[in-house]
Amino acid sequence: MANNDNKHRRSMSMLLYIAVAIFVYLLLSNTLLPGLLRQQIQTVSYSEFLNKIESNEVTKVDLNTGNRNIRFTTGSGDSEKIFETTQFPNDSTLVQTLREHKVDFSASIPDNSANMLMYALIQYGIPLIIFLGIGFFINRSLKRAMGDDGPSMNFGGGFGGLGGNLGRSSAKEIKGEDTGITFKDVAGQEEAKESMQEIVSFLKTPDKYKEIGARCPRGALLVGPPGTGKTLIAKAVAGEAGVPFFQIAGSEFVEMFVGRGAAKVRDLFKQANEKAPCIIFIDEIDAVGKRRDASLNSNDEREQTLNQLLSEMDGFDNHKGIVVLAATNRPETLDKALLRPGRFDRRIPVELPDLKGREAVLQIHANDVKMEPGVDLSIVAKSTPGASGADLANIINEAALRAVRFGRRRVTTEDLTESVDVVIAGAKKKNSVLSEHEKDVVAYHETGHAIVGAIQKNDAPVTKITIVPRTSGALGFTMQVEDDERYLMSKSQAMDEIAVLCGGRAAEELIFGEMTNGASNDIERATAIARAMVTQYGMSDKLGMVTLSQQQSRYLGGGSSLTCSEATAEEIDAEVRRIVEEGHQRALQTLKENRFKLHEIAHYLQKKETITGEEFMNILKRENTFAPVDKNINDEGSSTPSEE
C-alpha cells in the first residue's frame, strides 16, 4: 500500500514538474525566441526595396500572396542578406520591374500546415527536451547531495521543495542499546553523570514522577571545553535509559534554501514524537542558537530556524519522555530565550578532568590496549594537567602505535612517557641538526628554566629536561609536574611562575651576553600572566582590586578585551612591564647565585640531551665540583666565551 502511494505521489510530482517546465518554456519562447528570429531578417520600407532593385542589388524575390509580404535576398554566398517588406497595394508595375532587372521571383499561396508543424517541433520541441533534461539533472544532483540516489522526482510534498530530502531532518537515529555506551564508559565527569542520572530515571520509570506531579526537565545544556566528553555523556544517557537517540549538529539545520532549516526542526520533533520516549541531541547548538539582534550581520534563515526550535521545545508534551540535550563550548553566544527554564532547564558543566579524573580516563582507554604489568598511569595523569579526555585517549593511542613501531606486543611506561611528549610538544625531529653553538644556547636556556623553578618555593618540581628539537618548533623544553592538583594561585605563586618563564632568557643574557628569539613563547606566557594579574585578579598594588577586562570564549581559549579608558590602559601596560621585569630580575639574580650549577647542569644536558628530574636534582644538591672552563662570567653578570 505504501509503495502504491509512493508511486502515485512520484507520478503526480513528475506531471507537475513537466507542466511547470512547459509553462516556463512557452512563456520564454513567445517572448524571447521570436524576437531573436526576427533579428536575423531585416525589415525595410517598400521604397527602399524598389531602390535596391533599381541598383541591381536584389538577386531573389519571394512574393507571398497570403500575407502580402515580400521577402527578398541581396548578394550571394557569405554576403547574402535577407530582407522583408510589405507589398504596396495595387502596384501593377512590380512584376514588370523585376523582369527588366532580371530578378528571379516566385509567387505562391503557401500551405503552412507542414511548415508550421516542423517549425513548432524545431522551435518548441527540441529546446523543451533540453530544458527538461537540464531540470532532471539538477533535481537528481540535489537528491544525491541530500542522500537520496533514487531516480524518481519526489518533491517532498510540493514542487517548492526542490529535492526529496531538503525538508527532512538529517538526524541520525540510534537505538539506545545500540549506542554501546553507558555511564561506566564515562570517567572524570562524576558531577555531570550525577546530574544526568535523574533524566535517566525519568525515562526508565516515568510513573513515579507523574504520580507526585513532577515533570522531567525538557532540556539540558552541556557546557565545556572541546574534547571533554559532552557527546559521550549524551550517548551514555540514551544507553542507560535504553531509548532511541537522535543526533544532529547545529550547523545541519541551516540550509541555502529559505525555510528549510525550520522544516528540518519540525521533522526532527515529528520523528521524536513517533519514537517517544527518546533523546534529541544537538551538538554545537551555538551554530543555530546564537543570540538574535538587529545588526546588519543578522541571518534571517538562522533566526527563523531558531524560532522554530523555540516553538517546538515549548510545544511538545514532556510527559511523553522527550528530552533535548545540547552541547556547546560557546554558551555566552546563545540566545537568552533558549536558556530560560522550560526549554533548557539545566546547565551542566563538563570541565577538564582533575588528577583523579585523568587517571580514571586513562584507565578506561588503557582497557582496550595491552599493557605491560606494572605500568603506572598516575605518572601520566600527573604529567598532563589541563588535558581533556580526547587528549588522554590520544596519548594512549600514541603509546600503542609507538609500541608497534618498535616491535613490542605490549605498551611500556617508556611508550607512555614518550607519547606525552609527542602530544605536548610534538614528535622528535630526526633530521634536525643544531650547530654546537645553538645546542649550547638551548642547553643553557632550558637549564635556566629548571634552576629558577627548583629554587622558587612555590614552583612545581622538575621532572624532565630535554634539548631534542620537536615538530612543534620547540628546540627543547623543561617539564614540571605538581605533586597535587592546584585550584588557586596566589600572587607569590604567579610571580614565581613569571620568574621561571624568564629563566631561559636570563641564562642567555648571563652566559652569552646577548639574547635570541628562543624565549618568544616564554615572554608571551609571562606577559599573559602579568596582564591577568592586573586586569582580572586584582593583584596590582597600583590599580587595586578592580576588573579591567572581559574574557571572551572562555572554553575556546579566547582572549580578553579591556573595559577601561585609554589612560587606564596605559597604566595597565606600564604595570605589566613592571611585573615582568621584576620576574626577569629575580631570575637573573637566582642564576648569578647558582652560576656554577648552571654550567655543570648545562654541560651534562648537552652530553645526554635528555635528563630526568632526579638527575637534575642530584647535580643541583651536591657540592660545587664543576669549574667553568669555556665561559668567563664577570661580576656584572655579562659573559664572553673563552678562547679554545
Curated annotation (Swiss-Prot):
Its main location: membrane. Keywords: ATP-binding, Cell membrane, Hydrolase, Membrane, Metal-binding, Metalloprotease, Nucleotide-binding, Protease, Transmembrane, Transmembrane helix, Zinc. The chain crosses the membrane at residues 14-34, 118-138. GO terms for biological process: protein catabolic process; proteolysis. The active site is at E446. Disulfide bonds: none annotated. It is found in: Cell membrane. GO terms for cellular component: plasma membrane. It is an enzyme of class 3 (hydrolase). CDD domains: RecA-like_FtsH (cd19501). Its EC number is 3.4.24.-. In the central section; belongs to the AAA ATPase family. Homohexamer. This is ATP-dependent zinc metalloprotease FtsH. It comes from Lancefieldella parvula (strain ATCC 33793 / DSM 20469 / CCUG 32760 / JCM 10300 / KCTC 3663 / VPI 0546 / 1246) (Atopobium parvulum).
